Swiss-Prot record:
The gene is SPL7. PROSITE patterns: ZF_SBP. Disruption phenotype: Retarded growth and hypersensitivity to copper deprivation. Its cofactor is Zn(2+). Binds 2 Zn(2+) ions per subunit. This is Squamosa promoter-binding-like protein 7. One of its GO terms (molecular function) is DNA binding.
Length: 801
């Protein structure tokens, strides 16, 4: 210990080291504050620093040092009298010796007092609550509700039910939200919108779900324990099971996450019944399993059956379906913008229409897309091959992203084994199913109230999704009691009423209604949102569809009449949805990305079919919206883009339909002219429908018609010409070359319409010519009389003025 005496003391301390006898610790002074001991420890600290910068100094060996204790465990050395034998006592380091203020010579050290003052200033009210009368109360200052009757979870974290489920509370002067996994209050920026768990916990949760299942529970349990310790998660032990949250937390958590946990981690979820209240679904998650095969009306892409010669019969060229990707590898708050742009760029290659929605949580991308029937047929025939081509092919944007779930209409596929194998999953029988929605047309900018009928809807974690114009509309929903007949229910379906407060009055287009619960995701039913005139005409069109299904003139007047005709309304909904979607897509204002893409034949055919149907039904207001969007779309395109995408006959037919629709819309705006020439009332399509059938009802019935265009249409529509069956579904060249399989006849009532319009114009021209000739003859042969007549008319006009 001689080297210690040579070491200089601190600048402000002039203390000599104590004399040691044979380096025996028992010979140290027994004083409580022995400055020799202090200098000894201070020298140790300086030696540790000196060894880094200077070479070691040769000195006799030092006695072994006692391990350093933490400030919480350190205490002063007791005297020999207090400890009994001096040789048996254990030396502990003074807690002040590790303080930088004390080492620098600032005596006395005031750090403990400052720390205590800071703690008292930070949490004065919490300490007051802890030191109260012993009654367990909520830690929120403005609440302090009695939680003694609640479960152990709420008592441990000192939070009541209202504060735990509130969107935010004021705590320490800031808006905070309770994290049901951490058991603490965090600032609002730490949460995603609508979430009850902080972003860090959700990311940890997703990482746990992505781990491969292990047969032997030892390794998995060890990894789970390490991950839980690193994450400081709150674990409740009840009945020998470890659960990361209480049942109240699971009620507020994301249903899709809990549903997937049931397959991956544990079966210990607690069922519950959720109260029906207002939910904001602007950035809502929720994608469960799909519905049974027989419950998906949007995946039946056969043509709708025609009912005789009724004009309301309609079959769509490009049915609308749903494709959804549930991605587990991306954090909701860190979803790459570039990748999202790539996904939408890929979707923009689809031939007709699309509407995409992204929900956080497990990053769920849902797309409602309209494609030709032949493409849906190929996709339904071999879905695994097409999905493998897009997901598992190197270089694709989803390649190597790990596990994911793909919902393709009424089918479910999961990417397993580290993202290398795509497997189809069976659909649960108790999955929800929507029968119909009434009404299906709503005016933009006004409150929306609709009735939903379906099966297996009221289950735990039930929520409705109403998507429109790229976002989910906030709404409230409630159960509607179905009336009984003779003490027995006439229908097993359940009825719900959905109230949407407001919507954008300037946005028109399709909306989609879905429902999800713990059993999965239902089918979707489309709606249309437009202005008052569009809604009025859509109601008339819907009444014609009702007339085809209810020959005796039954009408829908109230919710009480719906229970006795659930099946009939379901059939009407599936029949009417094709026309409704085609009209809704047509009245939607085209986006900037869509105007940059060339128009293909499927779009031309769809526009021709929609225009033809609306012309026959004299729907002038809808025609005005469709024409405005179609003209805007055509003007922004290249002049030759229409010619390159389809044959001349389709282009000529489109121009004829646009001209005729423009005339009808113009006559509808001028009532006087419409009375002289009533639109569509004199159309020979209606009067002579047996002689000259409509294109709507007879697309493939005249094999000899349209010989000049038939070969080109068949060449484009044949599967071999567009590509092989194994070609990628989302390949741009294949999509653009695939068209409807129907033949377009040359004979139609459009020429009759054109001839009628031409004859009316010729008649007006003859009348005008006769009047001009009569006036010229009168001037030439009777100039005096004409002069007198002109003077008389002039005098009368001057007199009146």
């Amino acid at each position: 210990m001689s080297s210690l005496s040579q070491s200089p003391p601190p600048p402000e301390m002039d203390i000599q080291p104590p004399a040691l006898v044979n380096d025996d610790p028992s010979t140290y002074s027994s004083a409580l504050w022995d400055w020799g001991d202090l200098l000894d420890f201070a020298a140790d600290e300086r030696l540790l620093v000196d060894q880094i910068h200077f070479p070691p100094v040769l000195s006799p060996p030092l006695p072994p040092l006692i391990p350093t204790q933490t400030p919480a465990e350190s205490e002063l050395d007791p005297s020999p009298e207090e400890s009994g034998s001096g040789s048996d006592r254990v030396r502990k380091r003074d807690p002040r010796l590790i303080c930088s203020n004390f080492i620098e010579g600032m005596l006395p050290c005031s750090c403990p007092e400052l720390d205590q003052k800071l703690e008292d200033a930070e949490l004065p009210k919490k300490k007051r609550v802890r030191g109260g009368s012993g009654v367990a109360r909520c830690q929120v200052p403005d609440c302090e509700a009695d939680i003694s009757e609640l479960k152990g979870y709420h008592k441990r974290h000192r939070v009541c039910l209202r504060c735990a489920t509130a969107s935010f509370v004021v705590l320490d002067g800031e808006n905070k939200r309770y994290c049901q996994q951490c058991g603490k209050f965090h600032l609002l920026p730490d949460f995603d919108e609508g979430k009850r768990s902080c972003r860090r916990k959700l990311e940890r949760h997703n990482n746990r779900r992505k781990r491969k299942p292990v047969d032997k529970g030892g390794v998995a349990a060890e990894q789970q324990q390490v991950l839980s310790q690193n994450d400081n998660s709150v674990i409740d032990v009840e009945d020998g099971k470890d659960i990361t949250c209480s049942s109240d937390q699971r009620a507020e958590e994301e249903p899709s996450l809990i549903f997937e946990d049931r397959h991956i981690t544990t079966q210990g979820s607690v069922p519950f019944t959720r109260s029906i209240n207002a939910d904001n679904f602007v950035s809502v998650t929720g994608s469960g399993e799909a519905q049974p095969d027989e419950g998906m009306n949007d995946t039946k892409f056969e043509r709708s059956p025609s009912n005789g010669d009724n004009k309301s019969a309609y079959s769509t060229v490009c049915p609308t379906g749903r494709i959804s990707f549930k991605l587990y590898d991306w954090n909701p708050a860190e979803f790459p913008r570039r990748l999202r742009h790539q996904i939408f760029q890929w979707l923009a290659n689809m031939p007709v229409e699309l509407e995409g929605y992204i929900r956080p949580g497990c990053t769920i991308l849902t797309v409602f897309i309209a494609m030709p029937e032949i493409m849906w047929a190929k996709l339904s025939k071999d879905p695994v091959a097409y999905l493998d081509e897009f997901i598992l092919k190197p270089g694709k944007m989803l390649f190597g992203r790990g596990s994911m779930t793909v919902y393709l209409n009424n089918m479910i596929f999961r990417l397993i084994k580290g993202g290398t194998t795509l497997k189809r999953v069976d659909v649960k029988l108790e999955s929800p199913k929507l029968q119909f929605v009434y009404p299906t047309c709503f005016e933009a900018g006004k409150p929306i109230e609709l009735v939903v009928c379906g099966q297996n809807l009221l289950q735990p974690k039930c929520r409705f999704l109403v998507s429109f114009s790229g976002k989910y509309l906030p709404h409230n929903y409630s159960v509607v009691p179905a009336p009984d007949q003779d003490g027995k229910r006439s229908c097993n379906n359940k009825f719900y009423k959905i109230n949407i407060v407001n919507s954008d009055p300037s946005l028109f287009g399709p909306a989609f209604v879905e429902v999800e619960n713990e059993s999965g995701l239902s089918n979707f039913i489309p709606l249309i949102i437009g202005d008052a005139a569009v809604c009025s005409e859509m109601k008339l069109i819907e009444q014609k569809f009702n007339a085809t299904l209810f020959p005796e003139g039954q009408e829908v007047t109230a919710c009480s009449s719906l229970t006795c005709c659930c099946r009939d309304f379901g059939e009407r909904q599936s029949t009417f949805s094709g026309l409704l979607l085609d009209i809704a897509w047509s009245v939607k204002v085209p986006s900037a990305e869509r105007t940059e893409q060339p128009v293909n034949r499927c779009q031309i055919k769809r526009y021709n079919r929609v225009l033809n149907y609306l012309i026959q039904n004299n729907s002038a207001s809808i025609l005005g919206n469709v024409l405005h969007n179609l003209e805007t779309l055509v003007k922004k395109m290249e002049p030759d883009s229409l010619v390159h995408c389809t044959c001349d006959c389709d282009v000529r037919l489109l121009h004829e339909n646009m001209d005729l629709a423009s005339d009808i819309h113009r006559k509808h705006q001028s009532p006087i002219e419409s009375k002289v020439n009533p639109p569509s009332s004199g159309c020979c399509c209606v009067s002579s429908q047996k002689d000259i059938p409509s294109r709507i009802l007879n697309f493939n019935k005249d094999p000899e018609a349209g010989l000049d265009c038939k070969e080109r249409i068949q060449a484009d529509c044949s599967p071999d010409s567009g590509g092989k069956e194994t070609d990628p579904l989302l390949n741009k060249e294949v999509v653009m070359n695939v068209n409807d399989i129907g033949d377009w006849p040359r004979k139609s009532c459009i020429k009759t319409h054109s001839a009628l319009a031409f004859r009316s114009r010729q008649t007006m021209f003859l009348i005008a010519t006769f009047a001009v000739c009569f006036a010229v003859c009168a001037v030439l042969y009777h100039p005096n009389k004409v002069t007198q007549l002109a003077v008389a008319i002039r005098m009368r006009l001057v007199h009146k003025i």
